[in-house]
Amino acid sequence: PIRSSLDLFFFEVKAVDDQGNIDSTASKLILPIKNSAPEIQFRYRSNPLIANLNSDTSYTFPTRTFIWDSYDQDGNETITDVFYALNDTCDTCWIRLDGNAMSITLKELDIGLNTFFLKCKDIAGASSLTTKFPDSSRPSEAQHWIVKPIMGEILIVDDYPLDNSNNVLSWYSSMMDTLYGDHSYSYWEIGDELPYSATDVSANLNYFKNVFWFAAYNNTASASDTYNGAEASLV
């Protein structure tokens, strides 16, 4: 593989006859090869879409998995390092992963607004462009990412995306307020799609001792039935 920004490759061909005589005027070819920087991007649809969230904000609990694909014209094996950072891209903020890494599950994330940064580097030292989530250059994806705190031991899962005004969630929340008091439970609005990674589904549920999941069967083009997928992630 190319180990510098520009390298020279030498090719030489000699003819040999049946007596073992070697051509003294070998043909030579010198090729200057310029290294290509690697590329990295998030796996298709691995970040939530605004259309599925019915909001421009993605809310998660303190576990979030990011999945990506990397590519190098000189061969993917030349990618030696993947780096990620949270909220700050200072020189010492980056955390290194092996070059063949394709995902990371972050745990115990800071509560509030967060941004995830990602880049990679090849054996010649060339770095990819930095990609991030959220990113305004991808307007179909969520434009804000907020990590919610774990409150109480009860989780209400709102799996009713057609209830845009949240009347059902408000009703169940008022019942929980009456039974257990304010701030004694958490809620999770799924929207039209579960998180891309089943690891995140399991992590969200395992934060709590009791899960109250309400849903409405709809089988329409505008909303999917996500509880089946959630059940599969726990098997």
Range-by-range predicted roles:
Residues 1-149:
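Low-complexity, disordered linker/stalk regions enriched in Pro/Thr/Ser/Gly
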Residues 164-235:
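Helical hinge/lid and interdomain linker segments adjacent to catalytic or ligand-binding clefts
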Residues 151-162:
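Short beta-strand segments enriched in small/hydrophobic residues
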Residues 2, 162-163:
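Residue-level marker of alpha-helix boundaries and capping positions
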